[in-house]
Amino acid sequence: MEQSELGFIEKVVSLNRVAKVVKGGRRFSFSALVVVGDGKGSVGFGLGKAQEVPEALRKATEQARKAMMKIPLIEGTLPYEILGEFGAGSVMLKPASRGTGIIAGGAVRAIMEAAGVTDVLAKAIGTNNPHNVLRATMAGLSALRSAQLVSNIRGKLLEAPRK
C-alpha cells in the first residue's frame, strides 16, 4: 500500500509487459492497472500504457484519480449485498460484521483497501482476469445506493431503523 503526497492510497493491481510483433522482431511496452482511493469511501481505477514502467504507472494513477467515485459505507462495510458484472466475470460483495476484515483476493482486495472498507466478504466468479474482476467490482460498487439517496428518489422520509 503506497501513500501519495496528496493523501491517496495507490495500489498496483497488475503490471504487464506486452509485445507487438513487427517485421524486425518484437516491440515491448508496459501496461499498468492501478487503483487509487482516499480511504474514506472514494475509489477509482486507471489503465496506463507506455514504453517504460514509471510512465505507465503515472498514466494509470492519473486516470484513476480522474475516475474516482464515492461509495456509501456504513461503519466500514457495504450497506447491502450486491453482484457486479463485467464481461464473463461477476463479483459478489457482501457486508460483514465488524472485525471480519477484508476477505477478498487480488483486484477486489485492492479496491476495498483503497476505498477504506474494513469488513467485507467477496467472491470473484467466472474469471480470474484482473481487468474484468476490477471492472465487475467497480460496476457493483457504482450500483450501491445509500438509504438517504433511495428515500430522496422515492420521495419518502427516511425513518430510523427498527431494532
From Swiss-Prot:
Gene3D superfamilies the UniProt entry points to: 3.30.160.20, 3.30.230.10
S5 DRBM domain: residues covered: 8-71
SUPFAM superfamilies: dsRNA-binding domain-like, Ribosomal protein S5 domain 2-like
UniProt keyword list: Ribonucleoprotein, Ribosomal protein, RNA-binding, rRNA-binding
GO biological process: one example: translation
GO cellular component labels: small ribosomal subunit
Protein name per UniProt: Small ribosomal subunit protein uS5
UniProt organism field: Lawsonia intracellularis (strain PHE/MN1-00)
Taxonomy of the source species: Bacteria, Pseudomonadati, Thermodesulfobacteriota, Desulfovibrionia, Desulfovibrionales
Originating gene: rpsE
